[in-house]
Protein backbone atom coordinates (compact mmCIF):
# COMPACT_ATOMS: atom_id res chain seq x y z
CA UNK A 1 0.00 0.00 0.00
CA UNK A 2 1.29 3.46 -0.90
CA UNK A 3 1.20 6.55 1.25
CA UNK A 4 -1.32 9.37 1.05
CA UNK A 5 -0.24 12.08 -1.37
CA UNK A 6 -1.43 15.60 -1.99
CA UNK A 7 -2.82 15.70 -5.52
CA UNK A 8 -3.41 18.54 -7.98
CA UNK A 9 -5.53 18.56 -11.13
CA UNK A 10 -4.63 21.15 -13.75
CA UNK A 11 -7.56 21.77 -16.07
CA UNK A 12 -10.06 20.45 -13.55
CA UNK A 13 -13.21 21.76 -15.22
CA UNK A 14 -13.04 19.82 -18.48
CA UNK A 15 -14.80 16.47 -18.67
CA UNK A 16 -11.66 14.50 -17.86
CA UNK A 17 -10.86 16.83 -14.96
CA UNK A 18 -14.34 16.42 -13.51
CA UNK A 19 -14.09 12.66 -13.88
CA UNK A 20 -10.72 12.67 -12.11
CA UNK A 21 -12.30 14.47 -9.15
CA UNK A 22 -15.12 11.91 -9.02
CA UNK A 23 -12.70 8.98 -9.00
CA UNK A 24 -10.07 10.45 -6.68
CA UNK A 25 -12.66 11.48 -4.09
CA UNK A 26 -12.91 7.83 -3.03
CA UNK A 27 -9.16 7.14 -3.20
CA UNK A 28 -7.60 6.63 0.26
CA UNK A 29 -4.20 7.69 -1.03
CA UNK A 30 -5.19 10.94 -2.74
CA UNK A 31 -5.84 14.21 -0.94
CA UNK A 32 -7.13 16.71 -3.50
CA UNK A 33 -5.31 19.91 -2.62
CA UNK A 34 -5.26 22.04 -5.79
CA UNK A 35 -7.54 22.34 -8.82
CA UNK A 36 -6.98 24.83 -11.61
CA UNK A 37 -9.20 26.45 -14.21
CA UNK A 38 -8.56 29.68 -16.08
CA UNK A 39 -12.19 30.10 -17.07
CA UNK A 40 -13.64 29.40 -13.62
CA UNK A 41 -10.88 30.75 -11.37
CA UNK A 42 -12.24 31.78 -7.99
CA UNK A 43 -15.33 29.57 -8.23
CA UNK A 44 -16.15 26.44 -6.27
CA UNK A 45 -15.86 23.23 -8.27
CA UNK A 46 -19.43 22.52 -7.15
CA UNK A 47 -20.54 25.66 -8.97
CA UNK A 48 -18.94 24.43 -12.17
CA UNK A 49 -20.10 20.81 -11.77
CA UNK A 50 -23.24 20.67 -9.65
CA UNK A 51 -22.91 16.90 -9.14
CA UNK A 52 -19.69 17.50 -7.17
CA UNK A 53 -21.29 19.10 -4.08
CA UNK A 54 -19.31 16.78 -1.80
CA UNK A 55 -16.10 18.58 -2.79
CA UNK A 56 -17.52 22.09 -2.92
CA UNK A 57 -14.67 23.29 -0.71
CA UNK A 58 -12.32 23.00 -3.70
CA UNK A 59 -11.89 26.43 -5.27
CA UNK A 60 -10.56 26.68 -8.81
CA UNK A 61 -7.24 28.51 -9.01
CA UNK A 62 -5.52 30.12 -11.99
CA UNK A 63 -2.95 27.81 -13.58
CA UNK A 64 0.34 28.30 -11.76
CA UNK A 65 2.96 25.54 -11.87
CA UNK A 66 4.84 26.85 -8.83
CA UNK A 67 1.73 27.02 -6.64
CA UNK A 68 0.54 23.62 -7.88
CA UNK A 69 3.85 22.03 -6.90
CA UNK A 70 3.83 23.75 -3.52
CA UNK A 71 0.33 22.40 -2.87
CA UNK A 72 0.76 18.89 -4.26
CA UNK A 73 3.18 15.98 -4.63
CA UNK A 74 1.47 14.42 -7.66
CA UNK A 75 -0.11 16.25 -10.57
CA UNK A 76 -2.69 15.21 -13.12
CA UNK A 77 -2.32 17.51 -16.12
CA UNK A 78 -5.66 17.67 -17.95
CA UNK A 79 -4.76 20.71 -20.00
CA UNK A 80 -5.24 20.97 -23.78
CA UNK A 81 -2.62 19.80 -26.25
CA UNK A 82 0.26 22.28 -26.64
CA UNK A 83 -0.62 24.01 -23.35
CA UNK A 84 0.42 20.86 -21.52
CA UNK A 85 3.95 20.74 -22.94
CA UNK A 86 4.43 24.36 -21.87
CA UNK A 87 3.74 23.41 -18.24
CA UNK A 88 4.98 19.83 -17.72
CA UNK A 89 8.74 20.58 -17.84
CA UNK A 90 8.45 22.98 -14.90
CA UNK A 91 6.32 20.52 -12.93
CA UNK A 92 9.01 17.86 -13.31
CA UNK A 93 11.81 20.29 -12.49
CA UNK A 94 10.01 21.13 -9.26
CA UNK A 95 9.94 17.46 -8.29
CA UNK A 96 6.35 16.48 -9.02
CA UNK A 97 5.29 13.19 -10.56
CA UNK A 98 2.97 13.80 -13.50
CA UNK A 99 0.31 11.96 -15.46
CA UNK A 100 -0.41 14.00 -18.58
CA UNK A 101 -3.79 13.42 -20.21
CA UNK A 102 -3.05 15.41 -23.37
CA UNK A 103 -1.37 14.01 -26.48
CA UNK A 104 1.80 16.03 -25.96
CA UNK A 105 3.98 13.18 -24.68
CA UNK A 106 2.42 10.11 -26.33
CA UNK A 107 4.51 10.19 -29.50
CA UNK A 108 8.22 9.41 -29.35
CA UNK A 109 9.07 11.44 -32.46
CA UNK A 110 8.97 15.24 -32.29
CA UNK A 111 8.76 15.28 -36.10
CA UNK A 112 5.68 13.05 -36.08
CA UNK A 113 4.10 15.27 -33.43
CA UNK A 114 4.76 18.39 -35.52
CA UNK A 115 3.23 16.75 -38.60
CA UNK A 116 -0.02 15.71 -36.89
CA UNK A 117 -0.47 18.57 -34.43
CA UNK A 118 0.74 21.41 -36.61
CA UNK A 119 3.26 22.86 -34.16
CA UNK A 120 6.80 22.17 -33.03
CA UNK A 121 7.20 20.21 -29.81
CA UNK A 122 8.45 22.47 -27.01
CA UNK A 123 10.00 19.74 -24.86
CA UNK A 124 11.35 17.04 -27.20
CA UNK A 125 13.93 16.02 -24.59
CA UNK A 126 11.08 14.61 -22.45
CA UNK A 127 9.60 12.36 -25.15
CA UNK A 128 12.01 9.43 -24.55
CA UNK A 129 11.40 9.68 -20.79
CA UNK A 130 7.60 9.60 -20.92
CA UNK A 131 6.15 6.16 -20.23
CA UNK A 132 3.12 5.29 -22.34
CA UNK A 133 0.33 4.83 -19.82
CA UNK A 134 -1.59 1.75 -20.92
CA UNK A 135 -0.97 -0.47 -17.88
CA UNK A 136 -2.07 -3.77 -19.38
CA UNK A 137 0.68 -3.44 -21.99
CA UNK A 138 3.37 -1.24 -20.41
CA UNK A 139 2.99 -1.78 -16.67
CA UNK A 140 6.65 -2.07 -15.69
CA UNK A 141 7.78 1.12 -17.41
CA UNK A 142 4.92 3.03 -15.76
CA UNK A 143 5.93 1.94 -12.26
CA UNK A 144 9.29 3.68 -12.41
CA UNK A 145 8.26 6.77 -14.35
CA UNK A 146 8.04 10.39 -13.23
CA UNK A 147 6.08 11.32 -16.37
CA UNK A 148 3.35 9.13 -17.84
CA UNK A 149 1.57 9.96 -21.09
CA UNK A 150 -2.01 8.84 -20.66
CA UNK A 151 -3.27 7.09 -23.82
CA UNK A 152 -5.90 8.43 -26.16
CA UNK A 153 -9.38 6.97 -25.86
CA UNK A 154 -9.59 5.46 -29.36
CA UNK A 155 -6.09 3.94 -29.12
CA UNK A 156 -6.98 2.26 -25.83
CA UNK A 157 -10.00 0.56 -27.39
CA UNK A 158 -7.98 -0.60 -30.42
CA UNK A 159 -4.62 -1.49 -28.87
CA UNK A 160 -5.94 -3.72 -26.10
CA UNK A 161 -7.35 -6.34 -28.51
CA UNK A 162 -4.74 -5.95 -31.28
CA UNK A 163 -1.43 -5.72 -29.42
CA UNK A 164 -1.30 -9.37 -28.24
CA UNK A 165 -2.34 -10.67 -31.66
CA UNK A 166 0.39 -8.73 -33.45
CA UNK A 167 2.92 -9.92 -30.88
CA UNK A 168 1.95 -13.52 -31.59
CA UNK A 169 1.96 -13.03 -35.38
CA UNK A 170 -1.70 -14.03 -35.59
CA UNK A 171 -2.87 -11.19 -37.85
CA UNK A 172 -1.47 -9.50 -40.95
CA UNK A 173 -0.04 -6.10 -39.89
CA UNK A 174 -0.60 -4.77 -43.41
CA UNK A 175 -4.37 -5.31 -43.21
CA UNK A 176 -5.74 -3.72 -40.05
CA UNK A 177 -9.02 -1.77 -40.15
CA UNK A 178 -10.49 -0.05 -37.10
CA UNK A 179 -13.98 1.45 -37.28
CA UNK A 180 -14.66 3.35 -34.04
CA UNK A 181 -17.65 5.20 -32.62
CA UNK A 182 -17.49 7.61 -29.68
CA UNK A 183 -19.88 9.47 -27.46
CA UNK A 184 -19.75 13.23 -27.79
CA UNK A 185 -17.94 13.84 -24.49
CA UNK A 186 -14.81 12.75 -26.33
CA UNK A 187 -14.92 16.08 -28.16
CA UNK A 188 -14.47 17.98 -24.90
CA UNK A 189 -16.56 20.53 -23.05
CA UNK A 190 -15.87 23.68 -25.06
CA UNK A 191 -18.93 24.81 -27.04
CA UNK A 192 -18.81 23.98 -30.75
CA UNK A 193 -21.44 23.85 -33.48
CA UNK A 194 -20.69 20.23 -34.31
CA UNK A 195 -21.52 19.09 -30.78
CA UNK A 196 -24.77 21.01 -30.31
CA UNK A 197 -27.80 18.84 -29.50
CA UNK A 198 -29.60 19.80 -32.72
CA UNK A 199 -26.53 18.89 -34.77
CA UNK A 200 -26.03 15.48 -33.10
CA UNK A 201 -29.45 14.22 -32.10
CA UNK A 202 -30.96 11.59 -34.41
CA UNK A 203 -27.78 11.58 -36.46
CA UNK A 204 -24.56 9.64 -36.86
CA UNK A 205 -21.49 10.71 -38.81
CA UNK A 206 -17.86 9.98 -39.57
CA UNK A 207 -15.31 12.71 -38.95
CA UNK A 208 -11.60 13.34 -39.55
CA UNK A 209 -11.53 10.37 -41.91
CA UNK A 210 -7.90 9.24 -42.46
CA UNK A 211 -6.77 12.36 -40.58
CA UNK A 212 -7.47 11.71 -36.89
CA UNK A 213 -4.56 12.53 -34.58
CA UNK A 214 -4.81 9.20 -32.78
CA UNK A 215 -3.58 7.37 -35.90
CA UNK A 216 0.17 7.88 -35.27
CA UNK A 217 -0.26 6.89 -31.63
CA UNK A 218 -1.81 3.57 -32.63
CA UNK A 219 0.72 2.94 -35.39
CA UNK A 220 3.66 3.72 -33.10
CA UNK A 221 2.62 1.25 -30.41
CA UNK A 222 1.21 -1.49 -32.62
CA UNK A 223 4.50 -1.44 -34.55
CA UNK A 224 6.24 -2.37 -31.29
CA UNK A 225 4.01 -5.43 -31.11
CA UNK A 226 4.39 -6.37 -34.77
CA UNK A 227 8.13 -5.72 -34.93
CA UNK A 228 7.61 -3.76 -38.12
CA UNK A 229 5.92 -0.64 -39.42
CA UNK A 230 2.15 -0.78 -39.48
CA UNK A 231 -0.42 1.35 -41.31
CA UNK A 232 -3.88 1.27 -39.78
CA UNK A 233 -7.07 2.21 -41.64
CA UNK A 234 -8.94 4.13 -38.96
CA UNK A 235 -12.29 5.89 -39.22
CA UNK A 236 -13.88 7.56 -36.17
CA UNK A 237 -17.58 8.34 -35.86
CA UNK A 238 -19.59 10.51 -33.49
CA UNK A 239 -22.52 8.94 -31.66
CA UNK A 240 -25.49 10.89 -30.25
CA UNK A 241 -24.74 9.74 -26.69
CA UNK A 242 -22.60 11.23 -23.94
CA UNK A 243 -20.20 8.36 -23.13
CA UNK A 244 -18.73 5.25 -24.61
CA UNK A 245 -16.50 4.00 -27.40
CA UNK A 246 -17.18 0.95 -29.54
CA UNK A 247 -14.39 -0.12 -31.89
CA UNK A 248 -14.91 -2.78 -34.54
CA UNK A 249 -11.60 -4.13 -35.84
CA UNK A 250 -11.41 -6.10 -39.10
CA UNK A 251 -8.31 -8.28 -39.35
CA UNK A 252 -6.78 -10.71 -41.84
CA UNK A 253 -5.60 -13.80 -39.88
CA UNK A 254 -2.34 -15.52 -40.66
CA UNK A 255 -2.29 -19.19 -41.69
CA UNK A 256 -4.05 -21.54 -39.29
CA UNK A 257 -5.56 -18.79 -37.14
CA UNK A 258 -9.30 -18.69 -36.46
CA UNK A 259 -11.62 -16.90 -34.04
CA UNK A 260 -11.30 -19.57 -31.35
CA UNK A 261 -7.50 -19.34 -31.34
CA UNK A 262 -7.70 -15.56 -31.15
CA UNK A 263 -10.21 -15.70 -28.31
CA UNK A 264 -8.05 -18.18 -26.42
CA UNK A 265 -4.97 -15.99 -26.91
CA UNK A 266 -6.75 -12.89 -25.62
CA UNK A 267 -8.24 -14.78 -22.68
CA UNK A 268 -4.81 -16.09 -21.72
CA UNK A 269 -3.19 -12.67 -22.08
CA UNK A 270 -5.83 -10.87 -20.00
CA UNK A 271 -6.78 -13.62 -17.54
CA UNK A 272 -5.23 -11.79 -14.59
CA UNK A 273 -6.12 -8.27 -15.71
CA UNK A 274 -8.87 -6.83 -13.48
CA UNK A 275 -10.26 -4.43 -16.07
CA UNK A 276 -10.28 -6.49 -19.28
CA UNK A 277 -12.95 -9.09 -20.07
CA UNK A 278 -12.88 -11.31 -23.16
CA UNK A 279 -16.43 -12.49 -23.76
CA UNK A 280 -17.32 -16.10 -24.57
CA UNK A 281 -18.15 -17.33 -28.07
CA UNK A 282 -21.31 -15.74 -29.44
CA UNK A 283 -21.32 -12.70 -27.14
CA UNK A 284 -20.61 -9.13 -28.23
CA UNK A 285 -20.13 -6.12 -25.93
CA UNK A 286 -22.16 -2.92 -25.70
CA UNK A 287 -21.09 0.52 -24.50
CA UNK A 288 -23.81 0.36 -21.84
CA UNK A 289 -22.00 -2.63 -20.30
CA UNK A 290 -19.02 -0.49 -19.23
CA UNK A 291 -20.57 2.93 -18.59
CA UNK A 292 -18.90 4.72 -15.69
CA UNK A 293 -16.32 1.96 -15.19
CA UNK A 294 -12.66 1.33 -15.95
CA UNK A 295 -13.55 -1.84 -17.85
CA UNK A 296 -12.81 -2.93 -21.39
CA UNK A 297 -14.98 -5.71 -22.83
CA UNK A 298 -14.20 -7.42 -26.11
CA UNK A 299 -15.85 -10.04 -28.29
CA UNK A 300 -14.34 -12.10 -31.12
CA UNK A 301 -15.93 -13.63 -34.21
CA UNK A 302 -15.06 -14.35 -37.84
CA UNK A 303 -16.62 -13.89 -41.23
CA UNK A 304 -16.47 -17.41 -42.67
CA UNK A 305 -17.20 -16.15 -46.20
CA UNK A 306 -14.21 -13.79 -46.36
CA UNK A 307 -11.99 -15.44 -43.76
CA UNK A 308 -11.55 -12.16 -41.88
CA UNK A 309 -11.61 -11.84 -38.09
CA UNK A 310 -13.84 -9.30 -36.36
CA UNK A 311 -13.14 -8.01 -32.85
CA UNK A 312 -15.46 -5.58 -31.08
CA UNK A 313 -14.21 -3.75 -28.00
CA UNK A 314 -15.94 -1.21 -25.76
CA UNK A 315 -14.76 1.23 -23.10
CA UNK A 316 -16.09 4.32 -21.35
CA UNK A 317 -14.10 7.06 -23.07
CA UNK A 318 -13.97 9.21 -19.91
CA UNK A 319 -12.89 6.39 -17.59
CA UNK A 320 -10.77 3.65 -19.20
CA UNK A 321 -10.23 6.02 -22.12
CA UNK A 322 -8.99 8.89 -19.93
CA UNK A 323 -9.40 9.55 -16.21
CA UNK A 324 -9.72 5.95 -15.04
CA UNK A 325 -6.51 5.03 -16.84
CA UNK A 326 -4.87 8.08 -15.25
CA UNK A 327 -5.84 6.88 -11.76
CA UNK A 328 -4.66 3.37 -12.67
CA UNK A 329 -1.30 4.92 -13.61
CA UNK A 330 -1.26 6.92 -10.37
CA UNK A 331 -1.71 3.67 -8.46
CA UNK A 332 1.20 2.04 -10.26
CA UNK A 333 3.48 5.05 -9.82
CA UNK A 334 2.78 5.41 -6.09
CA UNK A 335 2.60 1.81 -4.86
CA UNK A 336 -1.15 1.49 -4.43
CA UNK A 337 -3.07 -1.56 -5.58
CA UNK A 338 -3.89 -0.99 -9.23
CA UNK A 339 -7.65 -1.27 -8.68
CA UNK A 340 -7.84 1.30 -5.86
CA UNK A 341 -10.76 3.71 -6.46
CA UNK A 342 -11.52 1.92 -9.75
CA UNK A 343 -13.43 -1.16 -8.60
CA UNK A 344 -16.95 0.27 -8.99
CA UNK A 345 -19.32 -1.74 -11.16
CA UNK A 346 -20.62 -0.14 -14.36
CA UNK A 347 -23.77 1.98 -14.22
CA UNK A 348 -26.89 0.57 -15.89
CA UNK A 349 -29.21 1.68 -17.33
Swiss-Prot record:
Matches recorded under InterPro entries: AGPR_AS, AGPR_type-1, NAD(P)-bd_dom_sf, NAGSA_dehydrogenase, Semialdehyde_DH_NAD-bd
KW Amino-acid biosynthesis (keyword) present: yes
GO cellular component, as recorded: cytoplasm
Location relative to the cell: Cytoplasm
Main localisation: cytoplasm
GO terms assigned for molecular function: N-acetyl-gamma-glutamyl-phosphate reductase activity; NAD binding; NADP+ binding
GO biological process assignments: L-arginine biosynthetic process
Record's keyword annotation contains Coiled coil: no
SUPFAM superfamilies: Glyceraldehyde-3-phosphate dehydrogenase-like, C-terminal domain (SSF55347), NAD(P)-binding Rossmann-fold domains (SSF51735)
Pathway noted in the entry: Amino-acid biosynthesis; L-arginine biosynthesis; N(2)-acetyl-L-ornithine from L-glutamate: step 3/4
Keywords carried by this UniProt record: Amino-acid biosynthesis, Arginine biosynthesis, Cytoplasm, NADP, Oxidoreductase
Catalysed reactions, semicolon-separated: N-acetyl-L-glutamate 5-semialdehyde + phosphate + NADP(+) = N-acetyl-L-glutamyl 5-phosphate + NADPH + H(+)
EC assignment: 1.2.1.38
Catalytic machinery residues: 153
Family note: Belongs to the NAGSA dehydrogenase family. Type 1 subfamily.
Task performed by this protein: Catalyzes the NADPH-dependent reduction of N-acetyl-5-glutamyl phosphate to yield N-acetyl-L-glutamate 5-semialdehyde.
NCBIfam families in the record: argC (TIGR01850)
Record protein name field: N-acetyl-gamma-glutamyl-phosphate reductase
Taxonomic lineage from the root: Bacteria, Pseudomonadati, Pseudomonadota, Alphaproteobacteria, Magnetococcales
